Every structure is written in structure tokens, then in C-alpha cells.
Amino acid sequence: MSEWDYKIFWDEAVNQFKEELAFSIFSMWFLPSKYEKSTENTVYLSVPSKFFRDQMIHNYKNGIEKKLFELSGKKISIDFIIKPNTSEDLSKAENEGGNDKKEDAAKPSSAESKKKSVKTEGGRGQHPDLRPEYNFEDFVVGPNNNFGVNAAIAVSTNPGSAYNPFLIYGGVGLGKTHLMQAIGNKIWDTTKLKVIYVTAENFTNEFVECVQKKMMPAFKSKYRKADVLLIDDIHFFQGKVETQEELFHTFNELYEKNKQIVFTCDRPPAELKNLSQRLKSRFERGLNVDLQTPAYEIRYAILLKKMEKHSTKIPNEFIDMVAKNVSSNVRDLEAALTKLIAYTELTKKTMDEATAKNLLRDIFGSTRQRNVTIDLIQRTVADYFSISISDIKSKKRTKSFSFPRQIAMFLCREMTECSTTELGNDFGGRDHTTILHGCNKIEEQIAADPSLEKIIHELRNTIKENTNK
């Protein structure tokens, strides 16, 4: 089979995936994956990063190989070449890929090696306002943030075209700033685009100072000439009428020029108070994604990832202790891990369980929420959908009952430490595979339906409020 034949089969596979997949998924993963070359029975695709490659291998490699077999009648393997996009590539429309021009290169995962290797596209060096350790490779992905991470990668791969504006919201310490700056770092490292990162507070302070010093032309020029504008913590703009007015006009000018705009917020835009409706509508115009509290397994993985950066290693039993007792956010997980590492390094003593619990008692005490029970979640979901708890636990399969039941399963798995077997017992004697199926079903629907994401967010808030009563 000639290389041309392999290319034809790949192009046809892409066309079929375009018909079969949601456009958001197709544009996120298949448009940036480009045919590079082929050898006997292997097709090589270029992808923009190591993280992107790993996700393609995990989620799509088997499906692609199956599709190629169906088309060609031969077993064809897929392999990946990492080629960070050039600015020329990024300027092309979503329906056209173009060829990459850089040599194969994988991004280093550590902040130190990243600092040494970011001289790309003209040797600009590290962005002065972005932290190098905030990159996609160091971001632990799980069901609580998978949709947001995938969308962020799409934005960084095709700024101004994929999702614009792009807004990331969620509670304190869940990775909003990390994800935003990862977008900025990726674009800065791989293109010549002008990237501006600013907190909403600093934007406001700078605006006030420029008004007082009659320097507004310079202020407008700075922000309206950005190719990528990243504004962190936009909830700070609440009640800042004049700043909102300036941001509104800055937004419009950048949006009309197809410049990428990214925001973070501690809540959905609809819940912001004292914010002009027209600005709120701008925030909601593009894609809004919610970063949720990580489940136990993801908290454990985050701690292991953080520990990679330290020479001192903490025994897994204490990592498990932290993951089980700190469920609030990533920042608190880091604080607990840092305390254990500091004790080990400074005292040179072997840590035992009693010592670890004593060291972390303040963190455990301040972050542990009052118990969220299965019963509370079931009651909250039942009330929301105007059904009874017995309906939630019943074997009824009509959608009016099965859908709320699966949402309750999803929230129980996220907000409690109960095993799937325990959850099955409290959901009418179901086995653990039924619980997993229900949770997975909701995760898939959240990724495809933003309105469901809002329902989950509202239920989660109601449950948390009820635990504090």
C-alpha cells in the first residue's frame, strides 16, 4: 500500500468521525491531529503536545485504528509525533489544518526544565506575568475538570476560533488560574501572538490610575491591541460601573477582531450581582466550563503529582490520609502535603500516623465540611425534580425517575466518601456497576449539555447550604 493510499484512508476516516462525533469533540481533537507520514501498516499523526498525545491514545486511538481497518481491510496502527503549532498554523480556520514546521519536541513537565526550553518563536523567553509551572502537563485531569481541560487545550491550539470568549468558573483552589495560565503559556510558547494576563483587581486599579493621570489612550491601546486577553477573577468587577463600561468596549473591539478572550470567575456569570446585563451576556456568549471539587481518586493523583517535584517522599499511607480528609480544594491539599514534607525534612524523623494527624489537625478541621449524607443528596434531588425518595430508590426505569436517580448517584459519588457498593445498597440494592454506569452517563451528558451542568451546580450548592444549617 502506498503512502498516498494511507493518506486517503485517513482523510476518509476523518470525514466519518466528523459525521459521528459532536462538533465540539471533533474540532477539539481531530482538527489539530494532522496526517504526517506513513510506513508499512503505521500512520503517523502530528499533535500539538505530549498532553494532547496522551489524551488521543487514551480516548481515540483504538477507535481510529478500528475505523482504518473497516476502510482498508488491513490492520493499521496509529502513532503520534509531537509538533507544537506555529503561529501560521494557529491563524488558519478550524476546517483547515496546515503543516507544522517545528521539529518533534515534547514539552518538559517540570517548571525548571520548562524555564530552560521556552525560547520559541523568536526566543521570547518566559512570559513575565505567567507562571511556568502552570502548564497542561502538570494539570491532573479527572471527571471534575475533564471537559474544561479539553476545551482549554482547544482554545490554546486555535485561539480566537475554537471557543471565544472562554470562561472558567468554580470555587477557590480548583485550578482556574492554573488552567487559564496554561492557555497563555501554550500560546506564548508556540506563537508570536501578544498575550496579556491580568487580574480583574489589577485591571481596575490600572484603569483608575490612568483616568486620574489622563492616560486613557495608553490604557486602551495596551488592552485593545492584545491577541489574547486573560482576565482572572472577573467577580471583582461587581459594582465597578466605570470599569465595567471600559471592559465592555475592550471586549467588543477584541471580539470583532477574533482575538481570544479568557475569563475566570468564582461562579457562573448568571449569579454575578451588580454587573451590567450587557456585560454579563458577553461573558455567557462563548463557552462556560465548571471546575468541580475533585473526588478521592483525583485528590490522591494530585498529591502524587505534587510530590514528584520534591526529593523527599511521603509514604502512601499518609498521602491516602490527606486525600481522604481534605476534600475542599487543591490548595488545601498542597498545604497539607507541604506540611508533611517540611516536617520530614527538618526533623529527619520517621513519621507515624499519630504525628501526621497532629500536624494536620488544623487543616483537617478547617477543610472538613459537615457530613454530606446520601440521604441529604437523595432528598435534595427528589425535591428538585418533584419526586419522592422512594422513586429515587425504586426500580422504575422511565426517564422522569431514572434521570434524577443517576444525578443523585453522581452527586453521592462526588460529595461523599462512600464506596460504589455502599451507594448501591442505599439506591435500592443495586450493584456497584449500576452506580458506575449512572455516574458515567451523567458525566457524558454534562460534557454534551451545558444546561445539565447548571442543574448539577445548583443542586451542589443547595446540598452544601443544607449541610451548614
From Swiss-Prot:
GO annotation, biological process: DNA replication initiation; regulation of DNA replication
Chief location bin: cytoplasm
Factors inducing expression: Constitutively expressed, part of the dnaA-dnaE (TDE_2786) operon.
DNA-binding listed as a keyword: yes
SMART domains, A to Z: AAA, Bac_DnaA_C
Any one cellular-component term (Gene Ontology): cytoplasm
UniProt KW keywords: ATP-binding, Cytoplasm, DNA replication, DNA-binding, Lipid-binding, Nucleotide-binding
Sequence segments annotated as region (Disordered): 89-131
Binding residues for ATP: 173, 175-177
Pfam family, one: Bac_DnaA
Segments for region (Domain I, interacts with DnaA modulators): 1-83
Region span, Domain II: 83-128
Region (Domain IV, binds dsDNA): 345-469
Region entry Domain III, AAA+ region, spans: 129-344
CDD domains reported for this sequence: AAA, Bac_DnaA_C
A single MF term (Gene Ontology): ATP hydrolysis activity
Cross-referenced NCBIfam families: DnaA (TIGR00362)
Domain remark text: Domain I is involved in oligomerization and binding regulators, domain II is flexibile and of varying length in different bacteria, domain III forms the AAA+ region, while domain IV binds dsDNA.
Subunit structure, interactors included: Oligomerizes as a right-handed, spiral filament on DNA at oriC.
Function field: Plays an essential role in the initiation and regulation of chromosomal replication. ATP-DnaA binds to the origin of replication (oriC) to initiate formation of the DNA replication initiation complex once per cell cycle. Binds the DnaA box (a 9 base pair repeat at the origin) and separates the double-stranded (ds)DNA. Forms a right-handed helical filament on oriC DNA; dsDNA binds to the exterior of the filament while single-stranded (ss)DNA is stabiized in the filament's interior.
Family to which this protein belongs: Belongs to the DnaA family.
UniProt-recorded name of the protein: Chromosomal replication initiator protein DnaA
Lineage, top ranks: Bacteria, Pseudomonadati, Spirochaetota, Spirochaetia, Spirochaetales
Name of the coding gene: dnaA
